[in-house]
Amino acid sequence: MASAGSGMEEVRVSVLTPLKLVGLVCIFLALCLDLGAVLSPAWVTADHQYYLSLWESCRKPASLDIWHCESTLSSDWQIATLALLLGGAAIILIAFLVGLISICVGSRRRFYRPVAVMLFAAVVLQVCSLVLYPIKFIETVSLKIYHEFNWGYGLAWGATIFSFGGAILYCLNPKNYEDYY
């Protein structure tokens, strides 16, 4: 700090690095993809005769034009999948808010580690849900027709990958990369 007689004050400036901005964008994209995955009607589809989402399961017999739908919230594994996915999404939302607030606050560095830890925790929860879902689906639902995991399931994987990328970016120490800025 400069002496009081010189009239100069030391001002600390915290530089926002591009890595953290890209990390925040990754977190935002993960949130958007999670929202799309949770609301998606198509996690599993089968030849326009069956579809399964996180909320309902619908079948249409080949001879009829009427869909018969029932809630999936009666099955333990589907509730567990939904809870893990929503838990991960909630953690991602908190990490996004902390990351966004850290941009507005002068001391950003102290928020980097908590955001990264939250994102890694969210990734673990979401990977567990995304591994549990196909295993239990194949184990419990017997379809005699070709079925495929559809775009809702893919969006959930996309959210998990973007969360992992954001966590990695928040782990990088900008002090080691000052030459690049």
Swiss-Prot record:
Compartments, record wording: Membrane; Cell junction, Adherens junction
Keyword entries, A-Z: Acetylation, Cell junction, Membrane, Transmembrane, Transmembrane helix
Record Gene3D superfamilies: 1.20.140.150
Principal localisation: membrane
Biological-process GO terms, alphabetical: cell-cell adhesion
GO cellular component: adherens junction; cell-cell junction; plasma membrane
Modified sites of kind N-acetylalanine: A2
Keyword Cell wall biogenesis/degradation: no
InterPro entries noted in UniProt: P53_induced, PMP22/EMP/MP20/Claudin
TM stretches of this protein: 21-41, 83-103, 115-135, 152-172
Membrane topology label: Multi-pass membrane protein
Domain of life: Eukaryota
Tissue specificity comment: Expressed in adult brain, fetal brain, cerebellum, heart, lung, prostate and thyroid.
Assembly and oligomerization: Interacts with CTNNB1, CTNNA1, PRKCI, PARD6B, FYB1.
Record function comment: Regulates cell junction organization in epithelial cells. May play a role in the transition from adherens junction to tight junction assembly. May regulate F-actin polymerization required for tight junctional localization dynamics and affect the junctional localization of PARD6B. During podocyte differentiation may negatively regulate activity of FYN and subsequently the abundance of nephrin.
Family indicated by similarity: Belongs to the TMEM47 family.
Protein name: Transmembrane protein 47
The organism's taxonomic lineage, starting at the top: Eukaryota, Metazoa, Chordata, Craniata, Vertebrata
Gene: TMEM47
